[in-house]
């Protein structure tokens, strides 16, 4: 009898456990956000935690986590729950898929709602203790906008719209329109720091905003961005196709490199598109993106192709040019105003050569001070025609370890191989977009970096859209310049921790070269220190270089300004 009783007790416990799982569903991780008392920093931390949670077990490309593909994720780890609470205490819980950051369902007030194309995995494991309802539309933007009878550009975002959206979803009202609010303020903001920054500003100022053309084009092209980044490979900036964004005025902007894409969008996380080729420095050559944006090569290695062609922008915004357009062996390379002429068009091949007019960029010797010329690819020494182009903006001859350098900032300056001191005179960008990006630089407490004249420090002030002192020109030589006086550069006054950052005349120095890291830091490559609001105290009016900590006083976002 004891054996039978024990068996019955075991059966009861097992059934109870099974029933409990059936009622409760899987205990998925949860990342919550409460509007009541929320500040900009609260929202920042919420998105940071959400990114970390969905990125568990991922690898990185250019410092950005690549979300896992469906085949790599067990059901018990497939979703993250995101409870959102409004000012009245109503809570709606979103279910977010860790493979793509999509909102796949939500619950509130003992009800749950699934899109009409919901999978059995979603319905069997999410909100199973609620009354499950199926919506008449899917979760893509076209369907949501049709169901809402409005477009995203007409829907306000910010604390008040989020408050109203939570109320509506809690009661099952205006579902499509409300989802358009929460999806952009949660999923899209997790994908793009630009969108995060827009929401943070609205929280700080208690205002609302509508998405602009640039923001909407980001949302529509996350998949193609992810593909271009993964196909280029780790530690590589140039893309092999382009990402088509829109400017604020709805004109097209074709982005062809990671550095520019990051400065414009602040992309923070990648959709898995294909397995990147293993590489550190070498440029890889993939196929152009074809088909609609949401189709991807799940599980396939990125396909390679032979070449792509770009300008090379360097010191003072001048381009690498074959002198006088001559294709004679030994013709030197020089700086010259950027254009579309064939002697400024450089083809990057999969054999690590860089070619113009059918000839190879060639080191005329492998010693410090050797000049760089074009030469017949078949007869030049092989170690003189090989180049690496890492993401930091150097162009390196790997045999010598020397880098391409522009010793003067003037047209007709002959380019040389020199020791790599991470100078601005050694910074380059491979792109067809030869003009500098003009942007504000937003940092600690949503304040803007401000210039205060030559030989003076920079510091933080409240952002003002019309302030010329807060407008910066981001050059291809990796300098940050005062937009109204482009001969002045952001400069670290030394390379030691706590050295001040000031404004000096641009001289191509290592102290004037900066790298916008994908973790939000702005790095001086020479010192390896980052731009830092001293002691997290804006009233000190001191910006310094300091070892990287990842703290908020070292986090920066560029906000591109209308041209």
Curated annotation (Swiss-Prot):
Glycosylation site list: 221, 368, 376, 483, 537
Signal peptide: 1-25
Domain Ricin B-type lectin: 305-431, 434-559
GO biological process entries: defense response; negative regulation of translation
2-gamma repeats: 527-554
Repeat recorded as keyword: yes
Enzyme class label: hydrolase
Catalyzed reactions: Endohydrolysis of the N-glycosidic bond at one specific adenosine on the 28S rRNA
Disulfide links within the chain: 274-302, 319-338, 360-377, 448-463, 489-506
Chain positions of 1-beta repeats: 357-397
1-gamma repeat intervals: 400-432
Keywords: Disulfide bond, Glycoprotein, Hydrolase, Lectin, Plant defense, Protein synthesis inhibitor, Repeat, Signal, Toxin
2-beta repeats: 486-524
Coiled-coil ranges (or none): none
GO MF terms, alphabetically ordered: carbohydrate binding; rRNA N-glycosylase activity; toxin activity
Placement of 2-alpha repeats on the sequence: 445-482
1-alpha repeat boundaries on the chain: 316-356
Function comment: Non-toxic type 2 RIP which strongly inhibits mammalian protein synthesis but does not affect plant nor bacterial protein synthesis. The A chain is responsible for inhibiting protein synthesis through the catalytic inactivation of 60S ribosomal subunits by removing adenine from position 4,324 of 28S rRNA.
Subunit field text: Disulfide-linked dimer of A and B chains.
Protein name per the record: Nigrin b
Species the sequence originates in: Sambucus nigra
Highest classification ranks of the organism: Eukaryota, Viridiplantae, Streptophyta, Embryophyta, Tracheophyta
């Amino acid at each position: 009898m004891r054996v039978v009783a024990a068996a019955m007790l075991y059966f009861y416990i097992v059934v109870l456990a099974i029933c409990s799982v059936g009622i409760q569903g899987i205990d998925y991780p949860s990342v919550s956000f409460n509007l009541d008392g929320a500040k900009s920093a609260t929202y920042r931390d919420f998105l940071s935690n959400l990114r970390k949670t969905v990125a568990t077990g991922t690898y990185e490309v250019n410092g950005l986590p690549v979300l896992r593909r469906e085949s790599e994720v067990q059901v018990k780890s497939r979703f993250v729950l995101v409870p959102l609470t409004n000012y009245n205490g109503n809570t709606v819980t979103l279910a977010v898929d860790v493979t793509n950051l999509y909102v796949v369902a939500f619950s509130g007030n003992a009800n749950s709602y699934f899109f009409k194309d919901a999978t059995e995995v979603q319905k069997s494991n999410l909100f199973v203790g609620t009354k499950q309802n199926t919506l008449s539309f899917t979760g893509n933007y076209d369907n949501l906008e049709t169901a809402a009878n409005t477009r995203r550009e007409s829907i306000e975002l910010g604390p008040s719209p989020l408050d109203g959206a939570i109320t509506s979803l809690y009661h099952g009202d205006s579902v499509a329109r409300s989802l358009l609010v929460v999806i952009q303020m949660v999923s899209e903001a997790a994908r793009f720091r630009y969108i995060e920054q827009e929401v943070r500003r609205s929280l700080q100022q208690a205002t609302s905003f509508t998405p602009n053309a640039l923001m909407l084009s980001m949302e529509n092209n996350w998949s193609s961005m992810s593909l271009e980044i993964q196909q280029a490979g780790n530690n590589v900036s140039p893309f092999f196709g382009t990402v088509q964004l829109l400017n604020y005025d709805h004109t097209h902007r074709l982005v062809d490199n990671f550095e520019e894409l990051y400065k414009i969008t602040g992309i923070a996380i990648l959709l898995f598109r294909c397995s990147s080729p293993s590489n550190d420095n070498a440029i890889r050559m993939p196929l152009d993106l074809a088909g609609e944006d949401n189709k991807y090569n799940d599980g396939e290695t990125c396909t390679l192709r032979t070449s792509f062609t770009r300008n090379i922008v360097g010191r003072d915004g001048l381009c690498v040019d074959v002198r006088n357009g001559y294709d004679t062996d030994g013709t030197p390379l020089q700086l010259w105003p950027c254009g579309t002429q064939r002697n400024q068009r450089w083809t990057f091949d999969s054999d690590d050569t860089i070619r113009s007019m059918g000839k190879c960029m060639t080191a005329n010797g492998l010693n410090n001070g050797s000049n760089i010329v074009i030469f017949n690819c078949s007869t030049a020494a092989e170690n003189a025609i090989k180049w690496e182009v890492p993401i930091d903006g150097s162009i390196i001859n790997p045999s010598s370890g020397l880098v391409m350098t522009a010793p003067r900032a003037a047209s007709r300056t002959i380019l040389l191989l020199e020791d790599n001191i991470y100078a601005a005179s050694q910074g380059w960008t491979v792109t067809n977009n030869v003009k500098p990006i003009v942007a504000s630089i937003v940092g600690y407490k949503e304040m803007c970096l401000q210039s205060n004249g030559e030989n003076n420090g920079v510091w933080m002030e409240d952002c003002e859209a019309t302030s010329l002192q807060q407008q910066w020109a981001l050059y291809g030589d990796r300098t940050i310049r005062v937009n109204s006086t482009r001969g002045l550069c952001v400069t670290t006054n030394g390379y030691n921790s706590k050295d001040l950052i000031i404004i000096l005349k641009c001289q191509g120095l290592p102290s004037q070269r900066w790298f916008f890291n994908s973790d939000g830091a702005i790095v001086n490559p020479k010192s390896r220190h980052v731009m830092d609001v001293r002691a997290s105290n804006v009233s000190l009016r001191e910006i310094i270089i300091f070892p990287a900590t990842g703290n908020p006083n070292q986090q920066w976002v560029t906000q591109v300004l209308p041209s």
